[in-house]
């Protein structure tokens, strides 16, 4: 019986896609996009690999460099959801224009991120205010250093709700429920934390009365 040598690139695109879908999409993009093979390059740009990009928990500078310089500008129109670390957020979001970006998840969120990035002076303002409809913050602020919970609520939680003008989904979670600052509304005006368009809210509250305040709002 004669053996025929079948190479990976001899396979139909449908089979190649099935194989590639079993891999991490970030690995597919990093390894195959912008390589000297038109077939793999085109396949790597499929939406299944480009609509959600997870840069969370990475400190690989060479990976960030390659994505920002070569990859993101080519797939920017497909990206709908970014998962990011604050240290790389500005660079990644400024690497291209993302017309379909609507969801953002941010790890290691701390209160100084609000004053640094969620401001009217930043170039990213239009992305945050006009495009983002779903925001997930993994809050890493420690209770011992935040001071008054009412003050934290006003300066952080209320500011976020007001700054992201098209937000319909807001999740603020913590790596540990005991370490995440709770929303504290009891001594604040009833309309302090309110939105006409927010339909989904997941947040830790300081006590049951704060939950009632939310329901009344």
Per-segment meaning from a language model:
Residues 1-217:
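Eukaryote-biased activation of long, low-complexity terminal tails and linkers
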């Amino acid at each position: 019986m004669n053996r025929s040598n079948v190479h990976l690139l001899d396979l139909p695109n449908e089979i190649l896609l099935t194989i590639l879908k079993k891999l991490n999409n970030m690995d597919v993009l990093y390894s195959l996009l912008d390589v000297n093979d038109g077939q793999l390059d085109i396949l790597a740009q499929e939406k299944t690999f480009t609509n959600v990009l997870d840069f969370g928990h990475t400190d690989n500078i060479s990976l960030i460099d390659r994505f920002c310089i070569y990859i993101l500008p080519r797939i920017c129109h497909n990206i709908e959801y970014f998962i990011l670390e604050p240290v790389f957020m500005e660079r990644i979001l400024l690497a291209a224009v993302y017309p379909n970006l609507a969801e953002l998840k941010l790890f290691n969120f701390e209160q100084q991120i609000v004053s640094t990035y969620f401001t009217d002076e930043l170039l990213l303002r239009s992305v945050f205010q006009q495009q983002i409809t779903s925001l997930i913050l993994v809050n890493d602020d420690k209770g011992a250093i935040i001071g008054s919970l009412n003050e934290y609520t006003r300066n952080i939680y209320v500011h976020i709700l007001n700054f992201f003008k098209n937000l319909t989904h807001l999740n603020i979670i913590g790596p540990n429920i005991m370490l995440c600052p709770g929303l504290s509304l009891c001594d604040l005006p009833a309309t302090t934390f309110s939105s006409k368009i927010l339909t989904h809210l997941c947040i830790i509250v300081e006590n049951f009365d704060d939950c009632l305040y939310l329901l009344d709002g």
